[in-house]
Amino acid sequence: MDNIATYVRANTKMKGNWSEVPEEIKDTFEKLGIPQAERTSLAGVGAQYDSELVYHNVRKEVAEQGVIYTDMESALTGEYADMVKEHFMKLVTPHDHKFAALHGAVWSGGSFVYVPKGVSVEIPLQSYFRLNAAGAGQFEHTLIIVDEGASLHFIEGCSAPKYNVANLHAGCVELYVGKNAKLRYSTIENWSKNMYNLNTKRAKVEEGGVIEWVSGSFGSHVSYLYPMSVLNGEGARSEFTGITFAGKGQNLDTGCKVVHNAPKTSSYVNTRSISKDGG
């Protein structure tokens, strides 16, 4: 871990038009079907390559509803800075564990989403994280705020090519679900088998709110992944559906945690794990 590079610069600035993305980066994401998915079934897409966002776009009709979907650096320095600073690293603090502390020190990239009160985003937003450099770490930060009575489905995808040296993924996800709001957070992680995946995810749910986690974990050499829901308001609810597959040479420790912090809260956990060839 001492040799992990904490920042690898992309060879391009972030683009809002897919045609402007450099060909070698575009080719990687096109093989994964990202542009096609954006055209047919997504309200917005963010694409991160190593430590930086290389593409970010949201449909005009979604933006006109007041939905904010932008990269974290722009959110922290632009007109949404006060909102971001109020929530940034408040659910996951640097004191939680050493990888949260590392994340807080070196984070880069990630997405910021805000859904205004009463707005329902009918089709999903997606961010895709590609770690392409050998011996590098990826430390993106995702911050989502779904205001009172609003709803959103957010999809996170992660992958990396295989190298003979270790890579590290120590991202952070903070989700705020307002009163009577609903958020579904879906993750597919198919890292290569040289990856150490030590991601921290946490949601805070207010009165009558719902958080739904959907998780598929299929790659990496080592994964430790336990999304946490803090049910902070009366009647708040958490649902977790997850599947994990560990093959030869893989050690995947996955599950979820729920803190029932208010009356009449409820949680449902449905997980399945498959081991093959000693995984």
Predicted regions and their residues:
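Conserved beta-strand/loop scaffold segments within soluble protein domains that form the structured core
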Residues: 20, 24, 31-32, 36, ...
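Short, Gly/Pro- and small/polar-rich lid/capping loops
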Residues: 1-45
